[in-house]
Amino acid sequence: MKYVGEQEFDHKNPQRTGVLICNLGTPESYKVKDVRSFLKEFLSDGRVIEIPKAIWWFILNGIILRFRPKKSAKLYESVWTEEGSPLLVYSQKIVEKVRALMPENIEVELAMRYGKPEMEKTLLSLKDKNCRNLIVL
């Protein structure tokens, strides 16, 4: 994410602190297309797979994304609940509990590194709420 400076910062607007609770991420559903999209985002990160990009691109797009999403979708379906992905459901519950303990000037949000809620959008939301300090967990 690129730094975006404030052209006209309003010092009269009360500053807030943001608490960003982060987790790795999860597909939006256990459907094959959502699992494929999640795996592509996750496995395209050069910090996750550290081999030359050209070689990895072929392996990822030519092999892994053709076969793995279907197998992984079945595994995701086996742990999925009526509420959704366990990782997302429990992460949201943690955020709600932490939010309830915080004073009014502290914003608590959840972001996933891969998938949704997206890290960049969540950070921009905190910025829009005038959060000038950020605690990342």
Feature map (PLM): residue ranges:
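Active-site-proximal alpha-helix that buttresses catalytic centers in soluble enzyme cores
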Residues: 1-137
